Amino acid sequence: MDSSEDNPTWTLESLKTSIDDASQAMQVATQLSEMLATNLSNLTLNPSIKLPYLPEYPSQLTGQLPSEKTPHRRRGVRTVLSERRYRMQKLIESLRLRYAKGIPRSDSQRQLQQQEDTEIRSRVRRFQCTCSYCQFKRNPSDDNYENYYNTTYSNYAMESNES
């Protein structure tokens, strides 16, 4: 399959001319870079130095689509501000779901909330010893944390207040 069949505007002559134009532009660019390198020691602006300008060529090659020459726009880049905004939205959403008692929820949301509540209760539940003495002979009121704190640390608190 011939390349001229793909795009009839491209011919052998147009390819040769575009290659010649590119080589001329490359020669001018190398001359410009050499001149800049030699004038690098003189860092002051000198209006007498005349730099050759690059010739203007059409930026769009024949057969190139206009959408191909435009740079892609960057999307989805995470910055500190966007990450903070995202976390704040998630926090607000979670607070709204947790404390919005008056708003009727769907069954799935209710079940999810009940599961979260039971998980929280299971984490908060106090330690219970599984030995036979604690299971059968201890008073259940002794398991109360406030009573334990008051009986264990009350003398220590009184001693620290006296000194």
Curated annotation (Swiss-Prot):
Pfam families reported for this sequence: PGC7_Stella (PF15549)
Keywords attached to this entry: Chromatin regulator, Cytoplasm, Developmental protein, Nucleus
Gene Ontology biological process terms in this record: epigenetic programing of female pronucleus
GO CC annotations on file: cytoplasm; nucleus
Compartments, record wording: Nucleus; Cytoplasm
Tissue and organ expression note: Preferentially expressed in oocyte.
Highest taxon of source: Eukaryota
GO molecular function, one term: methylated histone binding
InterPro entries cross-referenced by the UniProt entry: Dppa3
Entry note about domains: Mediates binding to H3K9me2 via N-terminal region, while ability to exclude TET3 from the maternal pronucleus requires the C-terminal part.
Free-text function comment from the UniProt entry: Primordial germ cell (PGCs)-specific protein involved in epigenetic chromatin reprogramming in the zygote following fertilization. In zygotes, DNA demethylation occurs selectively in the paternal pronucleus before the first cell division, while the adjacent maternal pronucleus and certain paternally-imprinted loci are protected from this process.
The name this protein goes by in its record: Developmental pluripotency-associated protein 3
Taxonomic source organism: Bos taurus
